[in-house]
């Protein structure tokens, strides 16, 4: 989750720190409570696939921890899975709704704009079910942000997993969209 605030624009440490943290942590809540937030941009995982393995370099730069890498069949895993990898609540059917509610609550509490990146799933083609539906996000916005208008921006490119070329499903139609609430 990316937080853009009038203060954080000039405070590199606060901005980079907020980008790498668990959005539900007490430290993040304290950090965001002390800022004047203009826009919240959320590009969370939509599926059970963990994104944390693809953010290894920013995590090392931020925390200066060198994780022990995971081995599978005698080789290091792709995407760098640290042994104690972070698991996003957005990747869990049980926790995803609560994580989205937290983001919408932040937008409501700060009376700021919210931009959510999303991709609808055509499950029968990809088998990659989303943790929450677009309908759920729109209902949540109606409940939490009743005075915000909605702009839905459709992109002409598909959501793509970071897979080897021979693992990519070519016939899917999972278009990326932005939901802009302001």
Predicted regions and their residues:
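SAM-dependent nucleic-acid methyltransferase catalytic core
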Residues: 1-55, 70-77
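Short, well-structured alpha-helical interface segments that form or flank functional binding sites
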Residues: 18, 39, 95-102, 174
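Generic recognition of flexible, low-complexity loop/linker segments
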Residues: 27-30, 102-105, 165-167
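A short acidic (Asp/Glu
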Residues: 29-35, 50-58, 125-134, 162-164
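Structural motif
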Residues: 41-43, 115, 180
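Mobile active-site "lid"/loop adjacent to the S-adenosyl-L-methionine
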Residues: 48-95
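Conserved Class I SAM-dependent methyltransferase catalytic core
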Residues: 84-149
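Class I S-adenosyl-L-methionine
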Residues: 134, 138-182
């Amino acid at each position: 989750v990316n937080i853009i605030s009038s203060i954080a624009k000039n405070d590199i440490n606060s901005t980079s720190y907020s980008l790498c943290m668990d959005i539900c942590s007490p430290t993040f809540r304290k950090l965001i409570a002390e800022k004047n937030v203009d826009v919240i941009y959320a590009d969370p995982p939509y599926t059970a696939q963990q994104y944390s393995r693809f953010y290894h370099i920013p995590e090392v730069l931020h925390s200066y921890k060198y994780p022990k890498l995971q081995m599978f069949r005698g080789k290091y895993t792709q995407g760098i899975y640290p042994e104690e990898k972070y698991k996003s609540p957005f990747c869990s059917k049980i926790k995803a709704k609560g994580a989205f509610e937290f983001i919408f609550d932040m937008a409501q509490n700060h009376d700021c704009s919210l931009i959510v990146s999303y991709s609808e799933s055509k499950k029968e083609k990809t088998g990659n079910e989303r943790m929450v539906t677009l309908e759920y996000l729109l209902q949540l916005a109606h409940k939490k942000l009743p005075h915000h208008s909605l702009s839905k921006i459709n992109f002409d490119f598909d959501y793509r997993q970071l897979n080897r070329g021979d693992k990519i499903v070519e016939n899917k139609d999972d278009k990326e969209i932005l939901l802009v609430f302001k």
